[in-house]
């Protein structure tokens, strides 16, 4: 009976280990899902403001050529007011998809908040940034010419690390945001 009891004890121990392993795996999956939700914009599927802030909080000096671009959708308030918030949401999703389709997978594309988006292009130069922005504009025009009622229009500003002696992503972000705001004001003046 002692051998039988220890065999039963072993079986119970094995079952306990299996149950604990399954529970740990479920918990790890749930934690990963919670982390994804914490850093992912539910509407667009892009990294959200928290993910953007986490990248910006890295205060390391940038060692390889990096660019930061800030986009702000134009007329989102007008679309929300005249066509409804669901139309505004569709415009945001459409623009997010456009950004993700144009910018290389290696680069960061996030929704900073509301109608603002942030892109970080790694290992780049000015010529590549210009080329990507030109491609974005062409793709935007194609989308807008398909007869879609929701026309994409945006202001953007960008900064690149090679223009600064020592830069962090936060420095690039602040400069890009400032240039974006200047471009937005210039567009408003031209449209008056």
Go through each PLM region and give its residues.
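Membrane-interface helix-start motif
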Residues: 1-6
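Juxtamembrane or sensor-core-proximal signal-transducing alpha helices
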Residues: 10-35
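Conserved nucleotide-binding and Mg2+-coordinating catalytic segments in signaling enzymes
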Residues: 32-54, 71-85, 93
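Catalytic-core segments of nucleotide cyclases and related cyclic-nucleotide turnover enzymes
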Residues: 81, 85, 130-137, 141-147, ...
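Active-site-proximal alpha-helical element of nucleotidyl cyclase-like catalytic domains
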Residues: 87-106
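Short helix/loop segment flanking the catalytic signature motif in cyclic-nucleotide metabolism enzymes
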Residues: 91, 118-136
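A short pre-motif secondary-structure segment
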Residues: 108-111
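PAS and PAS-like sensory/regulatory domains
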Residues: 150-155
């Amino acid at each position: 009976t002692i051998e039988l009891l220890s065999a039963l004890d072993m079986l119970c121990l094995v079952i306990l280990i299996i149950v604990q392993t399954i529970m740990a795996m479920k918990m790890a999956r749930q934690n990963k899902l919670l982390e994804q939700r914490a850093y992912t914009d539910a509407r667009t599927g892009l990294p959200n403001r928290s993910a953007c802030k986490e990248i910006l909080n890295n205060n390391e000096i940038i060692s390889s050529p990096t660019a930061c671009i800030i986009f702000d959708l134009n007329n989102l308030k007008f679309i929300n007011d005249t066509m409804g918030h669901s139309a505004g949401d569709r415009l945001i999703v459409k623009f997010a998809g456009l950004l993700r389709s144009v910018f290389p997978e290696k680069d960061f594309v996030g929704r900073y908040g509301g109608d603002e988006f942030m892109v970080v292009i790694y290992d780049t130069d000015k010529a590549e940034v210009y080329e990507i922005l030109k491609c974005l504009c062409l793709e935007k025009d194609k989308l807008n010419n398909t007869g879609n009622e929701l026309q994409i229009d945006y202001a953007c500003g960008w900064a690149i690390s090679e223009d600064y002696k020592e830069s962090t992503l936060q420095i690039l972000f602040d400069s890009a945001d400032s240039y974006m705001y200047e471009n937005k004001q210039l567009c408003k003046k031209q449209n008056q």
